[in-house]
Amino acid sequence: MTSLHSLAGLLLLMIIQSSWQMPDQDPDRNSMLLNENSMLTEPIEPLNMKRHSEGTFSNDYSKYLETRRAQDFVQWLKNSKRNGLFRRHADGTYTSDVSSYLQDQAAKDFVSWLKAGRGRRE
């Protein structure tokens, strides 16, 4: 079975190789196809170049506008009053944390005072 597969593969390879080596017999037909192909590609090439340059310009301009919008947004953030709100919130959080710490410390001091026996009335 393996030899049959090998023989079939070898025959297929020979057929493909012979078709690559056999040139077209009609030289007039080849020159006519060449002329038609060259006529088709000549006008398309400048159009492709024009489209490429327009695409490049559009891409660069889009990147510029995107950068400009980002800069304007950052400037707006700097000038807005939202920074003050965040600062006040942060100050309030700090004050609240300090108050909680002081209350915990006062509770610990009170418990240690009670343990020492100073809180008893005799």
From Swiss-Prot:
Transmembrane segments: none annotated. One of its GO terms (cellular component) is extracellular region. PROSITE patterns: GLUCAGON (PS00260). Residues 1-21 form the signal peptide. It is found in: Secreted. Induction: Produced in the A cells of the islets of Langerhans in response to a drop in blood sugar concentration. Disulfide bonds: none annotated. It holds the Pfam family Hormone_2. InterPro entries: Glucagon, Glucagon_GIP_secretin_VIP. One of its GO terms (molecular function) is hormone activity. Keywords: Cleavage on pair of basic residues, Hormone, Secreted, Signal. The keyword Cytoplasm does not apply. Promotes hydrolysis of glycogen and lipids, and raises the blood sugar level. Belongs to the glucagon family. This is Glucagon-2. It comes from Lophius americanus. The gene is gcg2.
